[in-house]
Amino acid sequence: MNGHLSLTSLIAAVVLLASLVTKHGNAWFRVILLVAMTFNVFSVVINPNDVWVSDGAPNPLAIPNVILLISLSVASLFEIGGLLQKNDRQASIKLLWWGLLAIPALGYIVGIPLFNSLWEALSGEAVDVAGKGPDWTIAKEMMFRAAKFLVFGIFTYLGACIGSFLNVVAYCVPRGESAGLRDSSCPKCKTKISRMDNLPVFSYINLSARCRACQVPIPARYLIVELLVAAIFGSLFLYELVTGAANIPAMGKVSYTGILWIVLYPKWHIISIYFFHCFFMSFLVVLSLIEWDRQKLALRFSIGLVLSFLIPATIFFTLQPVPAPDFLSSLTGIDGVSQFAKLAFAGVIGAAVAGLLGAVIQPPNHSTLIPAMALAGIVLGWQSILHVSILMLLLLLVVRFVPRLRGSLAVQPTFLLLMAVMIHHPFWKIVFEQFSI
C-alpha cells in the first residue's frame, strides 16, 4: 500500500464513523461495518512502510490514523454491547455461536499477517512466509490465506453435511427404513423443512435450536454429530491430507505438500486415502449412535459395511499400505490375493478382540462393536488393533473414575473405540514404528 491508499482509507473511515454514530439503520449492519473498518484501519496502521514512513519521510497521516483506529475500536465495543442489551438471551447465544465460527477465520486470515507485520516492524527480523517474494504485501498474504481457508472450510463443511445425513442413517437403518428417499420434516408438527432451514450447523444456530413452524426444541444431538464429523474431516485435512499422509506407516515421502500441491494440483492417491479414513470414522459415528439408542443392527448391514471397505482396499493397495504379516505374505505370490488375505486377517483379529472386550465390558448391545472393530482392523491393520484396544481400555478406566460419565459412556464401547481411533490416528506412524510386533 502507499500514501494515497492510506489517505483514501482515512477519509472513507471518517465518513463511515460519522454515519454510524447515529441511531439510524440496522444494528447488526452497523456492527459489521464498524468491525470491518476497524480491521481495515488496523491493517493500514500496522504497516510501517505506509503510515509511519512515506517516500523516506515521516507520514503526516500517522497520528490521525491511530486516533481513528482507537475511535473505531471504542465505537465497535459500544455497538456490540448495545446490541447484546437490546436482544434477548437467544439472540446473544446466536451471536456467540457466530463469533466462535468467525474468530478462527479472522485470526488466520487477518490476525496472523498483522502480527507478522508488527513483529517485522518492531524486531527488524523478516518472518518467513511460504511463497513470499520481493513484491509480497500484507494484502497478498491475506488473500493467499483466505484462499487456503476457503479450501479447508469446504472440506470441513462437507463433513458437517455428511454428519447431518448420518443422523438420518443412524435412525433409519435399525428400523429397516430408507435413509435416502425421504424429505426432512419436523417430527412434532410434520412440517416439511425448507432447504434454507436444513443447512448443517448454520440452520441450527439461525433457528436458535427450534422448529420454525411449531417452535419445538431441536435436539442438540443433531448439532453435536454435525460438529463431530466436521471435526473429523477438518482434522484429517490438516494432519493427513495436506501433509501427504505423513501420519500413515509405510507411505513414501511426498515431494510437495500443502493445499496447493495436494488439493489444487490433486494427488489422487493421497486424497483417496483421506476420504477412505474420513468415511471409516464417519461410520464409526453411525455405529456409536445406533449403540447409544440401544438399537439392534441388522446382520446384512454389518456385512455390507465391512465389504464396502474390504473390497476397495483390496483393489487399491494404497488405501491400506501397512505390510502383511510374514506368514501371510509367504502363502501366496499374487499381490491381490495377498492384500485380501492381509485385510481379512486384520478384520478377523478385530472381530475377535471385540468379542474379548465385549466379555470384559459387557455392553448391552454387541451388534455394533464387532463390525466396528472389524472395520478398524481392515482400515488400520491388525497391529493397530492392539494399540487402539489399549487406548479403549484406558479411556474406559477414565470414564469409570468420573462419576458424571460412569452411567452413560461406561457401556458405550463403540463410542470409546471412535475416541481411541481419533486419538491414535495422528500418531499412527510413530506408534507403528515404535511398538509394532
Task: List PLM regions with ranges.
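A membrane-topology feature that recognizes alpha-helical transmembrane segments
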Residues: 1-437
